[in-house]
Amino acid sequence: MTTRATFAAFLTSLKKNLIIMKKRHLLLIALPLLFSAGARAQSDSEQPYVSKKFTSPSLKELVVETSGGSIAVTGGQSDGFKVDMFVKPNNWNGKDELSKDEIEDRLEDYDILIGTEGNRVVATAKRKAGTKWDNKKSISIGFKVYAPRNVATNLKTSGGSIKIASLTGEQNFQTSGGSLKVEDLNGMIHGRTSGGSIDVANCSNEIDLETSGGSIKAAGLKGKIELNTSGGSITLNSINGDVVAHTSGGSVKGDDISGTLDTGTSGGSVRLANVSGSIKASTSAGSVEVELTKLGKYVDISSSAGSVRVTMPMDAGMDLNLKGNKVSIPLKNFDGRVEKEYVRGKMNGGGIPVTLSASSGSVYVN
């Protein structure tokens, strides 16, 4: 069959599968028209299979959804939106790359939408209802989007990672099977993953990130920050704001933290250095070491299965409540009660409540 005949047949096939959504004014990108510029086989060279641009200044939102691939969004572009679609074979089907014909055949099982809806850019790839799953023919459809800085997003994938960077506005993103990499965002930031780690850096305003299956690394954050994981460690560096960071399955480490910190773990130790402000820290399965450079409104540190060691300024007025198998603290200008296992009273006239507790270990204050 000639190339012209093959292309005509493919056009006819695609027309049968296009979804017409006039009421929603969704601009559907007829894939054959894009292919006419030169459809290509996909490999690790990372050339997009489909690429489309949208330049209207009224476009302020981005919606991306795919069931089997990764999503990457980068803001800061000056010439509107560019959407690239990538098609790859899944790792378990024994192929590293697909030919043009193979891609066209496998895309028959998907509804692909790339276009606009009101003030939104929409890019989705969904399996058609009723299609049978075939591991040998399964593919991963991913999207890379380049967007202006001031754009709100709603991103969702069930089978890949999400990378999002250089945006201002409300950002919502979730994946069931990959990691989150978040950088240079300002606004309401809400991200979830059920199967990967989180790496977040240089973000501000309101940050809410959670994973059920990986570690969290956070650096250069400012604002109201909430980080939670059920299955990994937490590392905090250069954080400023109201911070909540908890894990059920790993350690907590941090350096250069200011503001208010509420952190804890059920499965590891806590190590914090250069902390300035109010702190609540706890562990059920390890020791706690904290270096405070400046006291805030309170200090509340506890361990159920290890020792507590705190280095902090001793010249402020404090109300001390320390208890453990052994308590060691240099006391000056103190009025209260001192025993081997506890210290209670006022230091320097009283003031900031300082509560240190080790149920199965000692408490040391330097």
Describe every region a protein language model picked out:
Residues 2-366:
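Intrinsically disordered, low-complexity terminal regions
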